[in-house]
């Protein structure tokens, strides 16, 4: 059973031709996700000088994770957890190198 909305509030997914405000549009975009793709090529006398491939994904964090996009979790500049794992890896590497050097001097 659905609860009726108060008469003054429009449905965010209304399809009766009513205009949507910015918040409704943003909610839809973040909920569903939008992909914008484009290529820019610069040629001079049939010689390709530059190719730029643009891919833009606009989505909520939850939707991005559902799509398998989670690069911010492993980027040390963006995630404290990634910095911790990087620090632990560097620490283990330094300990291994110290053990090797101590083994050579004995």
UniProtKB/Swiss-Prot annotation:
Induction: Gas vesicle production is induced by growth conditions that promote production of secondary metabolites tiancimycin A and B. Keywords: Gas vesicle. It is found in: Gas vesicle. GO terms for cellular component: gas vesicle; vesicle membrane. It comes from the Bacteria. The keyword Iron does not apply. Its main location: other. The keyword DNA damage does not apply. GO terms for molecular function: structural molecule activity. Belongs to the gas vesicle GvpA family. This strain probably produces some gas vesicles from the probable gvpO-gvpA-gvpF-gvpG-gvpJ-gvpL-gvpS-gvpK operon; it can be induced to produce more under certain growth conditions. A minor component of the gas vesicle, might be involved in nucleating gas vesicle formation. Gas vesicles are hollow, gas filled proteinaceous nanostructures found in some microorganisms. It is not clear what function gas vesicles perform in soil bacteria. This is Gas vesicle protein J. It comes from Streptomyces sp. (strain CB03234). The gene is gvpJ.
